[in-house]
């Protein structure tokens, strides 16, 4: 072990080249990326930006923790001080333990101390402060650590199996040579599964391959014990998915004197399941178990229906179906065919385990991987076996599953193949392999979205299934400083990733050396790295002297591996309950050099120990949180009132990462750096991260919306392209590929980003321009495939169409790419498409105003596959105004004049739109007012009081009666009859 450095290195003394992975020591200079660095954020929300503060969930062991002195708080030059409020104890001369954890000796032993305006106590095992409520009275360790300690004392250690084997051997000293052979075979199995480093005195030596073959020859004829046969039968019945199927093994056969299945059959299934390293042994097992006549006679179960069968081709072999469901071989198959199909089926749907699998076997495609997690019995990430991981226990007592497991279960329920419902058989507490026993499971994971990766570029949707997935790999190098990193570090990491990365960018920060590498790879490459991390770390150590002599941690997604003194340990399952999750950062794009306010939204952002940083130009800068908000929708908000990115390049394009971490665990979000116009366009994407009509239940759902993953993929790809704008391609990785340009161009057109599409086209032309000043054939074929101009016409985006039509590869040569006459499928051109689209007068005007006047001259002559011209398309769709517009332009061109279409002194089209919008607003206003008054009237129920209505009715009745009486001819005693017609007029 090397000597510990005297002082932890400081950020302002080093300049890190994130592209070359090289460190340059500065002389009297300081590299500042932000106006906020080295901040000690003692906020109530739990932020404390002290780089040396340990996080118990990320360190695999107390012995693997950093031995270097504590940093000065994120790169500052001050010596560390005690983090207790009002404690000014200088820790520069204190012990290394107190310097690392920022606590003086007095407060580390005190029963209570005021930290962050809260009374807390220093935990001796966590090496951090907790609230007093987390401690039992008088205890120096928190209850969580004490519970783990008690569980470790009661838990059986992994070496107990070897001890039991030795005890069994010592106890049965009178056993015959056959039992000794069995013990030797079990010892070989244990050693083959990664436990050969822990040999116990007195245990039998590991037999060689020839000895194993001899042992198999001896014990292949041994019958299985009756109790083991019944146990296999019972587990097979429990694992069967269809309960109506008959039992594969009749228990009455044993009572009738039928011979039990041969031990050879069990070993054959075992070898097929575990993947024997000896090809001769596999051939021997398959031939001896299924091709040999004597073995078949011993294996065949007694049946009255087949007692007369003597031919080997007619023999019916029956074996209990451990995967659920009885399976009987067909009598029409030859022995060799049956053996091949039987072995293939066994390897794909049978997982017969004696012990937990070796980590080396996890990379085999036909062997399932065992579950690794942080053991409650140890702080080291080791491979543990838990009773709850048994498939039978999971079948009876299902636990809370992750979204990926739920997707797999849904897929498994809809499958009709009996092989997908297999259940592994565990004889000695083997860990769960059910998740990977299904051969379609890996295919399902690659088709699911996170990786976040994939696209068929089918318009108009923004799909990202085939795109590169951007992820982060973190290394923590103990007892190192930047000067000790080799110059070949980038090459070693690139080769370690099997040359899969399309892009890589690195950042470093103190805490020994925390090296963060952002990598763009395919989803399948990420899956291989996470599933085979142990083998990958082993290959990294073997191929590099620097890594073999280093003590380090590596975090790749869901797994954490550690290397110390040549030993590699792996933890596959982390406790993800309190992991931070960044949903979005607002704004999504910023202008370099301009100060802006930043809002970070996500989940679990205010937990204890979280740190907010900005990664840019190879280094980290701490960010000061000025406000926080914890909503009822489980979405937290962190506010950064003053955020500024300083660009070291004159080019205003780039990308940085906003990181929220707790040790090596955390989440990140890309932040685009561009000019003001592009930033304004990209910031419109925030609506897709915060839909206004999303209800609380949807926000709380752990499955994030698909659109978020698609937009995130778009931002990551755009960030990689912008980063290459100011970095030279001298590192050996391939240039930005055409499929990646294809994805960005389609997304930009579908989102109506005119400024962004021009910038992306400039970068594509710059990389694919030939010596003759023209684009190469591959680029032209790609542009013809995605048909950007047709997409703009479908969206009726006239501004985007004008941008594309006037775009030239070289302005001096006027070499235009997007012509209005370029033919697509069926010889359909943009002119035909626009002519058949309604309300596209502006689009027709733009297409016929191209710089070369191709659209105007081809309107009446350009035909498609059916012989129709754009003029015919417009006439068939009753778009006669299009033909009138083109005819007027042609007449003006012939006469050398310019005509203006003025109707009633104003633009009729614009007027109709404005009037319709105003009328619509007026109608809406009137409707709302009418509804308001209607509600008021309906609330009072009567317009007038009841007495007034009665009086009016009485007066009206009297008036009607008088009028009727006067209009009739009543009989009067004196005088003539009165009639209305006899009345005259005159003065009164």
Curated annotation (Swiss-Prot):
Query: SUPFAM superfamilies attached here?
Result: Ankyrin repeat, SBT domain
Q: What's a GO cellular component annotated to this UniProt protein? A: nucleus
Quote the cofactor binding remark: Binds 2 Zn(2+) ions per subunit.
Which residue ranges have biased composition labelled Polar residues? Answer: 250-262, 301-311, 327-358
Q: Which UniProt keywords apply?
A: DNA-binding, Metal-binding, Nucleus, Transcription, Transcription regulation, Zinc, Zinc-finger
Annotated Pfam families: SBP
Coiled-coil annotated spans: none
Renumbered residue ranges of the record's region Disordered:
52-79, 240-262, 289-416
Protein name, entry field: Squamosa promoter-binding-like protein 16
Q: Tell me which species this is from.
A: Arabidopsis thaliana
Gene that this polypeptide is encoded by: SPL16
């Amino acid at each position: 072990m090397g000597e510990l450095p005297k002082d932890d290195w400081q950020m302002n003394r080093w300049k890190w080249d994130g592209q070359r992975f090289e460190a340059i020591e500065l002389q009297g200079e300081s590299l500042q990326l932000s106006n906020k660095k080295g901040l000690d954020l003692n906020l109530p929300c739990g932020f404390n930006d002290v780089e040396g503060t340990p996080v118990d969930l990320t360190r695999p062991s107390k012995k693997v923790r950093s031995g270097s002195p504590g940093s000065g708080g994120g790169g500052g030059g001050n010596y560390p001080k005690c983090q207790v409020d009002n404690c000014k104890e200088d820790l520069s001369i204190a012990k290394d333990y107190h310097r690392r954890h920022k606590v003086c000796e007095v407060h580390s032993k005190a029963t209570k101390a005021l930290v962050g305006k809260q009374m807390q106590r220093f935990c001796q095992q966590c090496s951090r402060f907790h609230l007093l409520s987390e401690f039992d009275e008088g205890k120096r360790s928190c209850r969580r650590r004490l519970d783990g300690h008690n569980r470790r004392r009661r838990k059986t250690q992994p070496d107990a199996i070897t001890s039991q084997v030795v005890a069994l051997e010592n106890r049965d000293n009178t056993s015959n040579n056959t039992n000794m052979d069995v013990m030797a075979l079990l010892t070989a199995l244990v050693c083959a599964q990664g436990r050969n480093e822990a040999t116990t005195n007195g245990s039998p030596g590991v037999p060689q391959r020839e000895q194993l073959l001899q042992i198999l020859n001896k014990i292949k004829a041994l019958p299985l014990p009756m109790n083991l046969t019944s146990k296999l039968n019972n587990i097979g019945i429990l694992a069967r998915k269809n309960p109506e199927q008959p039992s594969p093994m009749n228990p009455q056969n044993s009572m009738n004197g039928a011979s039990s299945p041969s031990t050879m059959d069990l070993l054959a299934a075992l070898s097929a399941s575990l993947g024997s390293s000896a090809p001769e042994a596999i051939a021997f097992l398959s031939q001896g178990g299924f091709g040999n006549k004597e073995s078949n006679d011993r294996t065949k179960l007694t049946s009255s229906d087949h007692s007369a069968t003597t031919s080997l081709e007619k023999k019916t072999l029956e074996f209990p179906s451990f995967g659920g469901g009885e399976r009987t071989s067909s009598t029409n198959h030859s022995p060799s065919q049956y053996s091949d199909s039987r072995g293939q089926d066994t390897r794909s749907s049978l997982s017969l385990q004696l012990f937990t699998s070796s980590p080396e076997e996890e990379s085999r495609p036909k062997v399932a991987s065992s579950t690794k997690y942080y053991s409650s019995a140890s702080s080291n990430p080791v491979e543990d076996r838990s009773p709850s991981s048994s498939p039978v226990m999971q079948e009876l007592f299902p636990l809370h599953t992750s979204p990926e497991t739920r997707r797999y279960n849904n897929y498994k329920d809809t499958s009709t193949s009996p092989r997908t419902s297999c259940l592994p058989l565990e004889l000695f507490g083997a860990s769960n392999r059910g998740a990977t026993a299904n051969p379609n499971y890996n295919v399902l994971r690659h088709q699911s979205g996170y990786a976040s990766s994939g696209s068929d570029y089918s318009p108009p949707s923004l799909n990202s299934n085939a795109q590169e997935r951007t992820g982060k790999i973190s290394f923590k190098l103990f007892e190192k400083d930047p000067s000790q990193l080799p110059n070949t570090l980038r090459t070693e990491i690139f080769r370690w990733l099997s040359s899969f990365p399309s892009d890589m960018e690195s950042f470093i920060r103190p805490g020994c050396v925390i090296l963060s590498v952002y990598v763009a790879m395919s989803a399948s490459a990420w899956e291989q790295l996470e599933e085979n991390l142990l083998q990958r770390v082993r290959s990294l150590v073997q191929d590099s002297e620097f890594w073999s002599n280093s003590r380090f941690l590596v975090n790749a997604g869901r797994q954490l591996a550690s290397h110390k003194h040549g030993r590699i340990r792996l933890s596959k399952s982390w406790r993800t309950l309190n992991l931070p999750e960044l949903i979005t950062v607002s704004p999504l794009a910023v202008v370099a050099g301009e100060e802006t306010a930043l809002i970070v939204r996500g989940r679990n952002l205010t937990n204890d120990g979280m740190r907010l940083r900005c990664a840019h130009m190879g280094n980290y800068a701490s960010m000061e949180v000025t406000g926080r908000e914890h909503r009822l929708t489980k979405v937290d908000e962190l506010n950064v009132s003053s955020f500024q990115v300083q660009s070291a390049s004159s080019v205003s394009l780039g990308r940085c990462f906003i990181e929220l971490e707790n040790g090596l665990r955390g989440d990140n979000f890309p932040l685009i750096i561009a000019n003001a116009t592009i930033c304004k366009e990209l910031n419109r994407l925030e609506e897709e991260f915060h839909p206004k009509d999303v209800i609380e239940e949807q926000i709380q759902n752990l499955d994030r919306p698909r659109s978020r993953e698609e937009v995130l993929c778009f931002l990551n790809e755009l960030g990689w392209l912008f980063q290459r704008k100011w970095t030279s391609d001298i590192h050996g990785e391939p240039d930005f590929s055409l499929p990646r340009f294809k994805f960005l161009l389609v997304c930009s057109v579908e989102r109506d980003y005119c400024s962004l599409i021009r910038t992306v086209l400039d970068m594509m032309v710059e990389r694919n321009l030939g010596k003759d000043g023209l684009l190469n054939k591959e680029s032209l074929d790609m542009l013809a495939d995605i048909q950007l101009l047709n997409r703009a016409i479908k969206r009726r985006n006239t501004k985007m169409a004008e941008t594309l039509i006037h775009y030239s590869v070289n302005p001096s040569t006027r070499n235009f790419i997007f012509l209005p006459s370029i033919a697509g499928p069926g010889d359909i051109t943009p002119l035909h498409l626009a002519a058949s689209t309604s309300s596209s007068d502006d689009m027709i005007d733009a297409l016929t105003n191209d710089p070369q006047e191709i659209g105007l001259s081809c309107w009446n002559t350009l035909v498609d596959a059916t012989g129709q011209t754009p003029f015919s398309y417009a006439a068939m769709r009753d778009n006669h105004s299009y033909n009138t517009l083109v005819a007027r332009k042609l007449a003006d061109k012939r006469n050398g004049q310019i005509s203006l279409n003025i109707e009633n002194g104003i633009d009729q089209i614009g007027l109709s739109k404005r009037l319709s919008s105003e009328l619509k607003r007026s109608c809406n206003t009137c409707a709302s007012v009418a509804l308001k008054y209607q509600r008021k009237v309906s609330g009072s129920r009567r317009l007038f009081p009841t007495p007034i209505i009665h009086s009016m009715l009485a007066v009206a009745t009297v008036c009607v009666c008088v009028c009727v009486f006067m209009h009739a001819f009543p009989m009067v005693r004196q005088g003539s009859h009165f009639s209305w017609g006899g009345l005259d007029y005159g003065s009164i």
